[in-house]
Swiss-Prot record:
The keyword Cytoplasm is annotated on this UniProt entry: no
Organism: Danio rerio (Zebrafish)
Domain CHCH as annotated: residue spans: 61-105
Source domain of life: Eukaryota
Domains: entry comment: The CHCH domain contains a conserved twin Cys-X(9)-Cys motif which is required for import and stability of chchd4/mia40 in mitochondria.
Protein name, UniProt field: Mitochondrial intermembrane space import and assembly protein 40
Ribosomal protein listed as a keyword: no
Underlying gene: chchd4
Principal localisation: mitochondrion
Function: Central component of a redox-sensitive mitochondrial intermembrane space import machinery which is required for the biogenesis of respiratory chain complexes. Functions as chaperone and catalyzes the formation of disulfide bonds in substrate proteins, such as COX17 or MICU1. Required for the import and folding of small cysteine-containing proteins (small Tim) in the mitochondrial intermembrane space (IMS). Precursor proteins to be imported into the IMS are translocated in their reduced form into the mitochondria.
Signal peptide: none
Recorded GO MF terms: protein-disulfide reductase activity
PANTHER family assigned: COILED-COIL-HELIX-COILED-COIL-HELIX DOMAIN CONTAINING 4
C-alpha cells in the first residue's frame, strides 16, 4: 500500500514493489503556448517580476527566497530619487538570512579578484632580495635530471 509522509515542506512518497512495477498513469501536460512566464526575461510585459526567470539563479526559491523577493521587489518598484534607497531594511533582512546558510550563499572575499595563481601567490619582485637570490642559487646548484 502506497502512502505519503509529510516532513516539513517535503512529501515523501512510499510505494510498494507492485506500485513501482505497474505502468504509470500520469498524464503529461503540454506546455501552454499562452503561458505568460514562458520565453520572457526578468521583467514580464506587464512590468511584473518573472520569478521563474532562470537569470535569478534560483535566488527566489530556497531558504531565503522570500527575503530575496521582498528586497528585489522593493528595489524594482522603488520610486525614490536614488532607486532602492528605501529598501535598505529589506536587503539587510536578506543578508541576515543568507549568513545563516553559508553553504548555500558563500561570502565573496576580496581575494576573489586575485590573479589566477591564487590569493596566496606573491609575485617574486615582492620577495626580499635574499629570498629570490637563494631560490635562484638553489636552481642552478641542483639542475634537474631527466
Amino acid at each position: 500500500m502506497s502512502y505519503c509522509k509529510q516532513e516539513g515542506k517535503d512529501c515523501i512518497i512510499f510505494v510498494t514493489k507492485e506500485d513501482h512495477e505497474a505502468p504509470s498513469n500520469a498524464e503529461l501536460v503540454e506546455d501552454d503556448p499562452n503561458d505568460p512566464y514562458e520565453d520572457h526575461g526578468l521583467i514580464l510585459p506587464n512590468g511584473d517580476i518573472n520569478w521563474n526567470c532562470p537569470c535569478l539563479g534560483g535566488m527566489a526559491s530556497g531558504p531565503c527566497g522570500q527575503q530575496f523577493k521582498d528586497a528585489f521587489s522593493c528595489f524594482h518598484y522603488s520610486k525614490e530619487e536614488i532607486k532602492g534607497s528605501d529598501c535598505v531594511e529589506n536587503f539587510r533582512g536578506m543578508q541576515e538570512c543568507m549568513q545563516k546558510y553559508p553553504e548555500l550563499y558563500p561570502q565573496e572575499d576580496d581575494n576573489d579578484s586575485a590573479p589566477s595563481g591564487g590569493a596566496n601567490t606573491a609575485p617574486t619582485d615582492s620577495l626580499p632580495a635574499s629570498s629570490t637570490d637563494s631560490t635562484a642559487a638553489a636552481a642552478t646548484e641542483n639542475p634537474a635530471t631527466s
